[in-house]
């Protein structure tokens, strides 16, 4: 007879869902939008509610707000930001103001930028280092042209996280339908910019509703996060993937036995023994030593200010770039870029300007190609670009220029244009790609067929740059007649 065995069934507790890993690194953010949408008031309220305002500052704010108080009897929080005399007199923001605040979970660096059209260049400056953009919109007015301009500039500068802060919602009697229409319209516009990560929040910066504390008592229909809750969950821009980059700012020669190249590491890392290349010359050397103010370092990473010592005497000047030999930037005479025009005279077609990128300064001819239509998000052909226009241009250099695309490295992919006549900075720009001499955009794996006189080809093949990439090339020596036939057959494909 077989005995029955009763199995004990053990019920395991359900596994808890994996928790999202919170990014606790300091977050850099920018407030932008049209004039009088409440950017300075919002930051002032953030500082006030996160207890970032010291007692003496609070007393000064209460005193300076006398006679400026609103119907609620609240201080004028914007005064915490408007530091210039002209700003206080006009009640507007002109300069970029940086402020710091923190919560129990994270610290923040916020840039308050001007909304007026004539100060667009200051807004671009603030956006160039930000991880996230808070785009303010007056709930009564909806999306304006300057709103679209600021969103576009932020997107071009690589910001992919947006908070759509629909401010002054209290002045619309907390109109839910109006808020949802603004959020819908902006999401449609943002798709044309390639921006998909958008958090829309209805708020009253003056009253502090949905800023640090919930505004659900006034807006029971909104159950989303507050502004601070959203910021605490945002991510810092991911590290860019290019190799070592050092733009030489100064050649240090304190004595006959020492020669070092000073600058701030703009990408990647470096250590003694690494092979590097000097561009645009193409010379190769090894890193002998890395020196800082009072230390000899074992390595250096992006953001470090260093003096680099090489193992041999090479010709290096201010403006040259020292790069990892196995991860080189693009070098050439022609590049495509996107720019923001910053001066009333705009960009004249074919005019020669100074281009400054890092410590390098070169002559360049700028040819406008297209201008962004802010209302539609479409690009239209353009012969010139006037103040505040966002455009695509072609850059042509007399001597080889060296860049990374901006989306790969912000430091080595950005530049400003300087008018040689007035010395004004007339545009800021971002490199999108290299153009070959045949007019095509440089792409990974693309081949270029050139027909050169034999003596010129021999000079090119004798260079160190060519030698370092010899295994990537194919050389065929042919007669002039054969070259003409090859060219005729290939031209239609180039």
Swiss-Prot record:
<keyword id="KW-0548">Nucleotidyltransferase</keyword>
<feature type="region of interest" description="G2">
    <location>
        <begin position="91"/>
        <end position="95"/>
    </location>
</feature>
<dbReference type="GO" id="GO:0070814">
    <property type="term" value="P:hydrogen sulfide biosynthetic process"/>
</dbReference>
<dbReference type="InterPro" id="IPR031157">
    <property type="entry name" value="G_TR_CS"/>
</dbReference>
<dbReference type="InterPro" id="IPR050100">
    <property type="entry name" value="TRAFAC_GTPase_members"/>
</dbReference>
<feature type="binding site">
    <location>
        <begin position="167"/>
        <end position="170"/>
    </location>
    <ligand>
        <name>GTP</name>
    </ligand>
</feature>
<feature type="region of interest" description="G4">
    <location>
        <begin position="167"/>
        <end position="170"/>
    </location>
</feature>
<dbReference type="InterPro" id="IPR000795">
    <property type="entry name" value="T_Tr_GTP-bd_dom"/>
</dbReference>
<dbReference type="GO" id="GO:0005524">
    <property type="term" value="F:ATP binding"/>
</dbReference>
<keyword id="KW-0547">Nucleotide-binding</keyword>
<dbReference type="InterPro" id="IPR027417">
    <property type="entry name" value="P-loop_NTPase"/>
</dbReference>
<comment type="pathway">
    <text>Sulfur metabolism; hydrogen sulfide biosynthesis; sulfite from sulfate: step 1/3.</text>
</comment>
<dbReference type="InterPro" id="IPR044139">
    <property type="entry name" value="CysN_NoDQ_III"/>
</dbReference>
<dbReference type="InterPro" id="IPR009001">
    <property type="entry name" value="Transl_elong_EF1A/Init_IF2_C"/>
</dbReference>
<keyword id="KW-0808">Transferase</keyword>
<comment type="similarity">
    <text>Belongs to the TRAFAC class translation factor GTPase superfamily. Classic translation factor GTPase family. CysN/NodQ subfamily.</text>
</comment>
<dbReference type="GO" id="GO:0004781">
    <property type="term" value="F:sulfate adenylyltransferase (ATP) activity"/>
</dbReference>
<dbReference type="InterPro" id="IPR011779">
    <property type="entry name" value="SO4_adenylTrfase_lsu"/>
</dbReference>
<keyword id="KW-0067">ATP-binding</keyword>
<comment type="subunit">
    <text>Heterodimer composed of CysD, the smaller subunit, and CysN.</text>
</comment>
<dbReference type="GO" id="GO:0003924">
    <property type="term" value="F:GTPase activity"/>
</dbReference>
<feature type="binding site">
    <location>
        <begin position="112"/>
        <end position="116"/>
    </location>
    <ligand>
        <name>GTP</name>
    </ligand>
</feature>
<feature type="region of interest" description="G5">
    <location>
        <begin position="204"/>
        <end position="206"/>
    </location>
</feature>
<dbReference type="Pfam" id="PF00009">
    <property type="entry name" value="GTP_EFTU"/>
</dbReference>
<dbReference type="Pfam" id="PF22594">
    <property type="entry name" value="GTP-eEF1A_C"/>
</dbReference>
<feature type="region of interest" description="G1">
    <location>
        <begin position="33"/>
        <end position="40"/>
    </location>
</feature>
<dbReference type="GO" id="GO:0005525">
    <property type="term" value="F:GTP binding"/>
</dbReference>
<feature type="binding site">
    <location>
        <begin position="33"/>
        <end position="40"/>
    </location>
    <ligand>
        <name>GTP</name>
    </ligand>
</feature>
<dbReference type="InterPro" id="IPR009000">
    <property type="entry name" value="Transl_B-barrel_sf"/>
</dbReference>
<protein>
    <recommendedName>
        <fullName>Sulfate adenylyltransferase subunit 1</fullName>
        <ecNumber>2.7.7.4</ecNumber>
    </recommendedName>
</protein>
<dbReference type="GO" id="GO:0000103">
    <property type="term" value="P:sulfate assimilation"/>
</dbReference>
<dbReference type="InterPro" id="IPR044138">
    <property type="entry name" value="CysN_II"/>
</dbReference>
<comment type="function">
    <text>With CysD forms the ATP sulfurylase (ATPS) that catalyzes the adenylation of sulfate producing adenosine 5'-phosphosulfate (APS) and diphosphate, the first enzymatic step in sulfur assimilation pathway. APS synthesis involves the formation of a high-energy phosphoric-sulfuric acid anhydride bond driven by GTP hydrolysis by CysN coupled to ATP hydrolysis by CysD.</text>
</comment>
<feature type="region of interest" description="G3">
    <location>
        <begin position="112"/>
        <end position="115"/>
    </location>
</feature>
<keyword id="KW-0342">GTP-binding</keyword>
<dbReference type="InterPro" id="IPR054696">
    <property type="entry name" value="GTP-eEF1A_C"/>
</dbReference>
<feature type="domain" description="tr-type G">
    <location>
        <begin position="24"/>
        <end position="240"/>
    </location>
</feature>
<dbReference type="InterPro" id="IPR041757">
    <property type="entry name" value="CysN_GTP-bd"/>
</dbReference>
């Amino acid at each position: 007879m077989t005995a029955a065995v009763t199995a004990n069934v053990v019920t395991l507790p359900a596994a808890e869902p994996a928790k999202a890993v919170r990014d606790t690194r300091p977050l850099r953010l920018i407030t932008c939008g049209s004039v009088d949408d409440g950017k300075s008031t919002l930051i002032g309220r953030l500082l006030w509610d996160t207890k970032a305002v010291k007692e003496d500052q609070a007393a000064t704010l209460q005193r300076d707000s006398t006679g400026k108080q609103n119907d609620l009897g609240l201080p004028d929080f914007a005064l915490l930001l408007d530091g210039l005399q002209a700003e206080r007199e006009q009640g507007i923001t002109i300069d970029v103001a940086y402020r710091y605040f923190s919560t129990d979970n994270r610290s923040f660096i916020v840039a308050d930028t001007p909304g007026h059209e004539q100060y667009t260049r200051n807004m671009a400056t603030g956006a160039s280092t930000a991880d996230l953009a808070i785009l303010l919109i007056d709930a009564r007015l909806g999306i304006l042209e300057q709103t679209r301009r600021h969103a576009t500039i932020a997107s071009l500068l690589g910001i992919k996280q947006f908070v759509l802060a629909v401010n002054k919602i209290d002045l619309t009697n907390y109109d839910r339908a109006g808020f949802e229409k603004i959020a819908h319209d902006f999401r449609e516009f943002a798709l044309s910019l390639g921006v998909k990560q958008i958090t829309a929040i209805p708020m009253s910066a003056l009253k502090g509703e949905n800023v640090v504390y919930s505004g659900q008592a006034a807006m029971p229909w909104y159950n989303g996060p507050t502004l601070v809750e959203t910021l605490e969950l945002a991510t810092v821009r991911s590290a860019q993937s290019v190799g070592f980059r050092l733009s030489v700012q100064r050649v240090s020669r304190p004595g006959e036995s020492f020669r070092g190249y000073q600058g701030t590491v703009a990408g990647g890392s470096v250590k003694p023994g690494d092979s590097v290349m000097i561009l645009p010359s193409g010379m190769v050397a090894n890193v002998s030593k890395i020196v800082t103010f009072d230390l000899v370092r074992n390595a250096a990473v992006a953001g470090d200010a260093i003096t680099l010592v090489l193992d041999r005497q090479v010709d290096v000047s201010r403006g040259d770039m020292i790069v990892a030999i196995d991860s080189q930037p693009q070098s050439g005479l022609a590049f495509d870029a996107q720019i923001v025009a910053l001066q009333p005279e705009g960009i004249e077609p074919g005019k020669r300007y100074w281009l400054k990128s890092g410590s390098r300064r070169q002559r360049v001819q700028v040819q406008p190609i297209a201008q962004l239509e802010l209302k539609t998000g479409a690009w239209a052909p353009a012969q010139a670009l006037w103040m505040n226009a966002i455009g695509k241009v072609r850059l042509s250099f007399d001597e080889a220029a060296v860049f990374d695309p901006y989306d790969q490295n912000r430091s080595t992919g950005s530049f400003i244009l300087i008018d040689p006549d007035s010395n004004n900075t007339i545009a800021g720009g971002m490199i999108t790609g290299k153009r070959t001499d045949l007019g095509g955009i440089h792409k990974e794996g693309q081949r270029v067929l050139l027909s050169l006189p034999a003596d010129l080809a021999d000079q090119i093949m004798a260079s160190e740059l060519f030698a370092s990439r010899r295994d990537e090339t194919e050389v065929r020596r042919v007669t002039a007649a054969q070259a003409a036939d090859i060219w005729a057959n290939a031209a239609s494909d180039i």
